[in-house]
Amino acid sequence: MITANSFERTIGGRKLVIESGKLARLADAAITIRYADTELLVTLCSAKKPREGVDFLPLTIDYEERMYAAGKIPGGFIRREGRPSEQAILAGRLTDRPLRPLLPKEWRNDLQIIITVIASDKENDADIWGVVGASTVLAMSEIPYEGPVGASRIGYINGEFVLNPTFAQLESSQLDLVVVSTRKAVVMIEAGSKEIPEDIMINAIEFAHKANQELIDLQDEIRAKLGKEKLPVPVLEIPEEVKTAVAAFVKGRVNEALSHQDKTARENAVEGLQAELVAALSETFAEGDILAAYDKEIKKAIRSTILEKDIRVNGRGIKQLRQLDAETGLLPRVHGSALFTRGDTQVMAITTLGSLQESQQLDGLSAEDTKRFMLHYNFAPFSTGEVKRSGSPGRREIGHGALAERALVPILPTPEEFPYTIRLVADVVGSSGSTSMGSVCSSSLSLMDAGVPVKKAVAGISIGLITGENGTYCTITDIEGIEDNYGDMDFKVAGTRDGITAIQVDMKVKGISFDIIRDAIYQAKEARYNILDVMDKALAQPKTELSPYAPRMYKINIDPSKIGSVIGSGGKTIRSIIEQTNTTVDIENDGTVVIGAIDEASAKKAIKIIEDLTKDIEAGSIYTGKVTRIMTFGAFVEILPGKEGMVHISELADHRVEKVEDIVKVGDDITVKVIEIDNQGRVNLSHRVILNPNAVPISRNRDSQPRRPGPFRPSDRSNS
């Protein structure tokens, strides 16, 4: 038996075990991390040589879900795992975002961390343990790394913070917060919440940071025992003579180029100055060094202007929003639409409503199997005026869509209140920073325009950070793309007037203090209110009527014991209803039936069929049915879908009838009255009493009547 190094802690009342040396022994570093009965294999491999021609850290983090982990066989024709699920992509991003700032920017060797979920107890989310596992293998490896980090999930239930809540606990929690931090500072925050007040959110982040310390202690213990000696950090210095020459050439001109309020004009000015610079110095110095030095001059100009003068590149104040505009009812025929504009950033959001049958089917390790609300974010290359490949969404698009979706979930009506599947598409048509928060604003308005009875409007804002020497810093409201590129933080906050619904924080520095967190959260609140004022002018309340092109949903309730009558054998009956009426029919186990139709007449037709299928036949009731069979002694009539009774030959007319065929034929419609239901459930009908209301029906001894093929009991043929 292979022996492994094992390390244990009790975290949140459950056992955490990290083992190394048993699996993936040829990887540069590998561990298994197990929390309760959820287990992951985390590996790290590094290329031996730097990759040529790259000017960034080539880090790849893949998060892979094995369906066997939850005892499931993958769906699809080939029955094996294919492209990662949306949840797996988001979990990979959750790991990448906090670790990247802690690795040397100068590192050029390919790094690949693969996180594989190999066991899932369906109670504990594996995503945060992917972060802890990835941090552990980096700490053990020879890669320079300024970690380790801890990662904790925090819930807020009945006024108490809960460390690493289970899936079941999260359903009743007002908060789903993930915080990743080092020993001293927070490096990543991600949250979805039900309008949590700012002070509670800050306290929750502090609670998580304290909980992370035990995970950092554990990794330090592992590193002390198993860690390799770290490699030196590569040095990529720009020669001093290049920096001096570039600074002298652009002196005073960089600030002038950056001062244009219009993004296109600013970019043209910056690129024009760059072209002059390269033309003047390229015979003396390497072009790569010139461009790197010029980039540093731009960064220095942007940051120093903010720190020293409280003025930004385009002349805005540090808390000043860009020009805002909101518009609804943008497109014809669609169910709901809105356009939100913030400076040069524009997002068009379109709402489409469908039946609950159109919910997304999830095939992953998630506890959920369907999803009725979807927000899909698209970022076209024309939004930045560039020529790029246009194709399926990447990790960034999926992440931005998930953030906007999370921000809107708390204000949506329940399926009981609004039995629709809701799909939002946020198309970025212009980008100069903060498109994800623009997507929140436009999507909130689009839902209202579609008539979705949302509880409140939601707005989003991004707060940036510029740090200086000796701990000085400045938080800036509504960052543009250039401020995001050269700044230290992107602190996104979405919410209503009553609280926060989502947070996502990414940074380029190695962590932020709680003073910065506090400033950013309250600065975002002030900006959010201003944005909501503009949105309210466009549309303050959801429309009271749905679009005429949206499907209509009608809800009825039936006896749960009659569900089988509606579904039928192998779904035959319900398929027939859908085909006959051109509707959709969803049935819940409690007997709730939701009918979706493009018009009221189709819905009423479907409702009538369902009510007839579940209705009990009562003596004395009158029905118009169809003759299904002719016997010598009478005719069988279907009076409700799948339910028959018999009209004896003597009850077909108010005179003597020699042959049944003289009065009716198969397929004829006939109005009859139920005159008797015997103790075996067989139904006797009369047409004679319809013709002559004063006629007295003849009571018969049904035991003397022949057995089927002619019994008169009500039947649900679809169940036979």
Swiss-Prot record:
SUPFAM superfamilies: Eukaryotic type KH-domain (KH-domain type I), Nucleic acid-binding proteins, Polynucleotide phosphorylase/guanosine pentaphosphate synthase (PNPase/GPSI), domain 3, Ribonuclease PH domain 2-like, Ribosomal protein S5 domain 2-like. It comes from the Bacteria. Its main location: cytoplasm. Residues 697-720 are annotated as: Disordered. The lineage of its organism: Bacteria, Bacillati, Chloroflexota, Dehalococcoidia, Dehalococcoidales. InterPro entries: ExoRNase_PH_dom1 (IPR001247), ExoRNase_PH_dom2 (IPR015847), ExoRNase_PH_dom2_sf (IPR036345), KH_dom (IPR004087), KH_dom_type_1 (IPR004088), KH_dom_type_1_sf (IPR036612), NA-bd_OB-fold (IPR012340), PNPase (IPR012162). Its EC number is 2.7.7.8. It is found in: Cytoplasm. PROSITE patterns: KH_TYPE_1, S1. It is an enzyme of class 2 (transferase). Residues 551-610 form the KH domain. PANTHER family: POLYRIBONUCLEOTIDE NUCLEOTIDYLTRANSFERASE, POLYRIBONUCLEOTIDE NUCLEOTIDYLTRANSFERASE 1, MITOCHONDRIAL. Its cofactor is Mg(2+). Belongs to the polyribonucleotide nucleotidyltransferase family. Gene3D superfamilies: GHMP Kinase, N-terminal domain, K Homology domain, type 1, Nucleic acid-binding proteins. Involved in mRNA degradation. Catalyzes the phosphorolysis of single-stranded polyribonucleotides processively in the 3'- to 5'-direction. It catalyses: RNA(n+1) + phosphate = RNA(n) + a ribonucleoside 5'-diphosphate. This is Polyribonucleotide nucleotidyltransferase. GO terms for cellular component: cytosol. GO terms for molecular function: 3'-5'-RNA exonuclease activity; magnesium ion binding; polyribonucleotide nucleotidyltransferase activity; RNA binding. Residues 620-688 form the S1 motif domain. It comes from Dehalococcoides mccartyi (strain ATCC BAA-2100 / JCM 16839 / KCTC 5957 / BAV1). CDD domains: KH-I_PNPase, RNase_PH_PNPase_1, RNase_PH_PNPase_2, S1_PNPase.
